[in-house]
From Swiss-Prot:
Species the sequence originates in: Escherichia coli O6:K15:H31 (strain 536 / UPEC)
Gene behind the chain: yegS
Required cofactor names: Mg(2+); Ca(2+)
EC code: 2.7.1.-
Name the UniProt record assigns to this protein: Probable lipid kinase YegS
Covalent S-S links between cysteines: none
């Protein structure tokens, strides 16, 4: 068997009792692969483990968890300086796994682990909000953000991505649109937004394709706004094709500025960020990620 450089797996603490994962790691170790494992307990652990990974000289840091774990690890990687920065590997173990699903990471743990270690490392973009917080997949605002933020953990654990839809249906009568103004390159819109999606990736909220044209290595962010005054009529209208849908506004830009007269909340790969002013910009070729050769999000 070919020799591969060492890897370090940063595993979300919720997945420590995953027996199939333990077995998959043991099998690869028996085949001669060096895989270090570190468990996250609190915010900031991922950044510390990335520092350790660099000292160990590993070629890949694998994010084992959901979109939030991938976000933490990728953010820590793009903050590294110097040469020989490890590539990002992805092991989908979260509730929705939106980014992993959209880029074509296998669901089978053994296949995903092998891809994370031996896959081709490709330069991909990330996005940054207000020069501080980053996201690798998507920033969502409005209805979708409130649903993903408020969905109970027990419901997510039991039903996965479907839980977001169920909780959303339960809350429809209480949700109102957000008034805001959005600017970008050759783009300007203002009005009432029920859902805002700004994507480096394509899907969020357990498989909802909010930005179906997004690519992760084109230097652009994709914007999609669902407009309207009432939730149910707007959701019904989304069943139409995009060309016939007056409730969908789309744009593409390397940056977007968002202003609101009141505080609104964006969900950045699962982490909420509230405010009235947001500057979101793309960071081209910010890190290398091990992806399948047929990844649909590459140009």
């Amino acid at each position: 068997m070919a020799e591969f450089p060492a890897s370090l797996l940063i595993l979300n603490g919720k997945s420590t009792d995953n027996l199939p994962l333990r077995e998959a790691i043991m099998l690869l170790r028996e085949e001669g692969m060096t895989i270090h494992v570190r468990i996250t307990w609190e915010k900031g652990d991922a950044a510390r483990f990335v520092e350790e990974a660099r000292k160990l000289g590993v070629a890949t840091v694998i994010a084992g968890g959901g979109d939030g774990t991938i976000n933490e690890v990728s953010t820590a990687l793009i903050q590294c300086e110097g040469d020989d920065i490890p590539a990002l590997g992805i092991l989908p173990l979260g509730t929705a796994n939106d980014f992993a699903t959209s880029v074509g990471i296998p669901e089978a743990l053994d296949k995903a682990l092998k891809l994370a270690i031996a896959g081709n490392a490709i330069a991909i973009d990330m996005a940054q909000v207000n020069k501080q917080t980053c996201f690798i997949n998507m920033a969502t605002g409005g209805f979708g953000t409130r649903i993903t933020t408020e969905t109970p953990e027990k419901l997510k654990a039991a039903l996965g991505g479907v839980s977001y839809i169920i909780h959303g249906l339960m809350r429809m009568d209480t949700l109102q649109p957000d008034r805001c103004e959005i600017r970008g390159e050759n783009f300007h819109w203002q009005g009432d937004a029920l859902v805002i999606g700004i994507g480096n990736g394509r899907q969020a909220g357990g498989g909802q394709q909010l930005c179906p044209n997004a690519l992760i290595n084109d230097g652009l962010l994709q914007l999609r706004i669902f407009t309207g005054d009432e939730i149910i009529p707007t959701l019904v209208s989304t069943l139409k094709s995009d060309e016939d849908n007056p409730n969908i506004i789309e744009g593409a830009s390397s940056w977007f500025d968002i202003q609101a007269p009141h505080e609104i909340t964006f969900n950045l790969d699962g982490e909420p960020l509230s405010g009235q002013n947001f500057h979101i910009e793309i960071l081209p070729a910010a890190l290398r990620c091990r992806l399948p050769p047929d990844c649909p999000l590459l140009r």
